Amino acid sequence: TKAAQDENDVVPGLESAARFVNLAGLAKVPGKNLELVAVLNGPATSAALGDDAYLKRHQRTNPNRKLIAALNEAGVDVMVCGQALAHKGFSTTEVANDVTVAVAALTVLAKYQSAGYALIPN
């Protein structure tokens, strides 16, 4: 996933997921018919960090936290790639409680696509 162009902005992939949820609502798609998973990896990995860890590394609170909480409330499962966490030197204990740590983004994508989910890249 791409990182935000400005460190004060949210990750574009999370914005896309929120847009999808909002458009589905406008189209009157029942929430029970939506099953969305957002996977953070690569440059967007730090978006998964809790505020304390993000503050320690970026000297500011995480601008993605409110959107991740809203996505969770809408039923979106927000995940982060465990391989990307390790590569970037982040501990799984630094990840926010409402973000699931996956073994790898590649395995998540393969699993969900084989189950019929559509990949919507950002």
Give the label of every model feature segment.
Residues 1-2, 39-43, 82-84, 122:
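Active-site-proximal beta-strand/loop segments in catalytic clefts of secreted hydrolases
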Residues 27-34, 69-75:
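Phosphate-binding glycine-rich loops and adjacent basic patches that engage nucleotide phosphates
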Residues 31-48:
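Acidic helix-start/capping segments at beta-turn-to-alpha-helix junctions
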